[in-house]
Each structure stands twice: as C-alpha cells, then as structure tokens.
Design a protein with these regions (language model features):
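Bacterial N-terminal signal peptides that target proteins for export
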Residues: 1-8
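Nuclease and nuclease-like effector domains acting on nucleic acids or nucleotide cofactors
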Residues: 1, 16, 20
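Active-site catalytic microenvironments in core metabolic enzymes, especially phosphate/sugar-handling
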Residues: 21-288
Length: 288
C-alpha cells in the first residue's frame, strides 16, 4: 500500500500540472490580448512579429526585456519563462534579417539560435505598438522612473523644467534612476541647468533637432545617435553658447524603464501567467 501511495501522489501532481499547462494561453493568444488592450492600429509593415519559436506553444511564464540578448534568454530560462517579449531586435538588425548571417554560417548567430531551439523559447518583438500608444508607453515609463511627470512643459513630453542642478549631478541622477553604467557628458560638467530635452532610444537627428528647437533647453539628454549628427550639432550649440551640456545615456538605459512599465501593464492582461521583467544589462562600463 505504501508503494501505491508513493506512486499515486506524483501521478496526481503530474495530472494537475498537465491540466494547468493545457489551460494556459498560447503565445499567440497572449499577443492577441496585448494588441487588443493596446488599442492601436498595427503599423504595416511592422517589426512587432514572432522572431523565433512556435506561437501555438503554451506559455509557462513571460520574460519582458529591453533586448533579448543571450544573457537575458538564459535568465529567462532560469525563471521558467518560455515567452520572451523584447523591445529591440533579437538578431542584430531592425527587421531581424538573417540572410547574410545564415549564408555565412555566423557562429554567434548559430549559438543563439541553438539555445533558443534547445529551450523551446518563443520570442516576440514589442516595438512599434508601445511607441504608437497615447501616451507613448516607453517614454511614459522613463518619465515615471525619473519622477518627471510634473516637470513636463506645456504638454510636450520631450521638454522638461527641472530642479536647479549641474550637468554632472543630473547625469549621476539619471544613471542611478535608469541603471546606466557609462553615461557620457559633453560641455561643462559644472554648468547649472534648469531645463532639459529628453529623447530616448535613437529617434534620429531630425527628431532630436526639432525637440531642441521647441525646448531651447539648457541640457540635451539622448539615448544615442551618430556622432556626426546630433552629437556634432549639440557640440556646435554648446560652442555657440546656446546649450550648456549634453548627456548620452545609451540606448538600453534610455528605454529600459519603458519595458518595466510594460511588464506592470501586462500582468492584469494575462491573469494567472507569471510576468517577469528581466532587465538587459548595460553593455558598457568605463575603463579606468
């Protein structure tokens, strides 16, 4: 009888687990819920598509991240998550185009694809949708992380009137709030600033320039840009005495809080499914 009892308990647990797994939504169903709740028209074409795995797979857990690096994928697997929702590309280009890398048998790509396949991961990109939401979910997350909601000037969510500080002190505050390890400064670090323009990610020179023109800021804060475009433009503005400084956060640090915001937003959309925010580590640090 003891042997029968020892067998009966694990079988019962297995049956319960199988039942729970069978009732879990598929990856495709999760994404459909996200699209429905977001309530924005899908861009055509869009990069918000499945990048790997089977959309019919039952979801055990969701890992939300800024960028699905191999490090992030490993941490997702450790948590038991099999659906990864990433803001940025998985395979090194905006549209995750694999043609050249596969034709050249790229070894880095091969390792990543094998890991994804071995662990039956499903990867979906969430980029165009959050930026199309009103307000932009990624920007809103950053503003919340900085506690700048009340600092927005005249409803322009890229222009802020901030407490009096210096460029250096502001850079340190941003690094602490956003988890950036290698913030860069241009201009006089001790310059006193009271207004800022903030553009996350990589919106490009035209968008950055227009924000600067609208805001006439003391300091410009960006994620990243080509050094011969926004960087040079702001350097010239500093030399001309029009701007006091610039802070470059890095792309990941400048948008990561937006995906943390998305993870919070997602939990009530998929009740009963674990949603983990798995931050992407800042790839840079300073050499001392």
């Amino acid at each position: 009888m003891k042997k029968l009892l020892r067998i009966a308990v694990p079988l019962s647990l297995l049956a319960s687990a199988a039942s729970a797994q069978g009732s879990a939504p598929t990856a495709g169903e999760v994404i459909a819920r996200i699209r429905d709740r977001a309530g924005v028209e899908a861009r055509n074409p869009t990069v918000d598509t499945f990048k790997a795995g089977d959309s019919a797979a039952r979801v055990r857990g969701i890992a939300v991240t800024m960028m699905a690096t191999l490090d992030v994928l490993k941490r997702a697997v450790e948590r038991g998550d099999n659906l990864v929702i990433t803001h940025e590309p998985t395979f090194y280009s905006h549209r995750d185009t694999l043609g050249v890398l596969e034709s050249e048998n790229d070894e880095v790509l091969a390792v990543k694809k094998k890991y994804i396949s071995d662990h039956k991961l499903v990867i979906w990109r969430f980029h165009d949708t959050p930026h199309a939401m009103k307000p932009d979910m990624i920007r809103a997350g950053i503003i919340h992380a900085l506690d700048w909601d009340s600092r927005i000037r005249n409803g322009d969510a890229e222009v802020f009137d901030i407490p009096r500080t210096t460029v250096r002190a502001l850079a340190a505050q941003l690094a602490g709030r956003l988890g950036a390890r290698a913030v860069r400064i241009s201009g006089d670090p001790l310059a006193v600033v009271r207004s800022a323009v903030l553009t996350e990610g990589f919106p490009g020179f035209a968008a950055n320039r227009h924000a600067i023109q609208r805001g006439s800021p003391d300091v410009v804060i960006i994620g990243e840009d080509h050094e011969w475009e926004t960087i040079e433009y702001v350097a010239d503005a500093i030399s001309a005495g029009q701007i006091d400084g610039m802070i470059v956060l890095g792309h990941i640090a400048s948008e990561q809080a937006g995906m943390a915001e998305f993870a919070r937003w997602l939990r009530p959309v998929v009740p009963g499914v674990r949603v983990d925010f798995v931050p992407t580590r800042d790839p840079f640090t300073f050499s001392r």
